[in-house]
Amino acid sequence: MTILSSVMQFSMLPLQGLTQGAQPIISFNYGAKNIDRVKKAFHLLLRSAACYSTLLWLLCMLVPQIFISIFTSDADLASYTIWALRIYMAASLLFAVQLACQQTFIALGNAKTSVFLALLRKVLLLIPLIFILPHFVSNPVFGVFVAEPVADTIAVATTAALFFREYKKLG
């Protein structure tokens, strides 16, 4: 699990940097009532983040040993970790939407929604799912690992719904 968490953190840093870097641009233009630039900046952010998330997802699915070899050379551990990483990172394709929308909520002065969405993903969904899902699948370990992509998918759907409702209000 430590390797998986490390890979998740290591791989998410560029995406977080990208989304946090776009925040002041979106915020400045929102404050200046330049809504067209807000929308253009968000679209550029979303496209850039989607490209990175897609690349990350492809690497995790096709060549996960690239990440795992950084942390271990033990063949048995690497084999098990490859299986687990593919499950754990299955929804990494969706990270672009989650993080781009969360940071844009902050840029638009709606930090409370952003905090709620961050808590939704890791606290309100992931922790209960880690305890619940193992009871509903034949392999309880699989249930623990699949909790991450299930929580991510639900959180992204919620984030997208809330964001696009807010986005329509921009005009």
Residue spans of the language-model regions?
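Small-residue-rich hydrophobic transmembrane alpha-helices
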Residues: M1-P64, F95-S114
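Short runs within selected transmembrane alpha-helices of multi-pass transporters and secretion channels
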Residues: Q16-Q20, Y88-A107, T113-K122, V144-A160
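Residue-level signal for functionally critical sites in structured catalytic/ligand-binding pockets
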Residues: M1, S6-F10, S73-D74, I106, ...
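Short alpha-helical transmembrane segments in multi-pass integral membrane proteins
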Residues: I26-A91, P134-G171
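Small-residue-enriched core segments of transmembrane alpha-helices in multipass membrane transport
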Residues: S6-Q9, R86, L119-P128
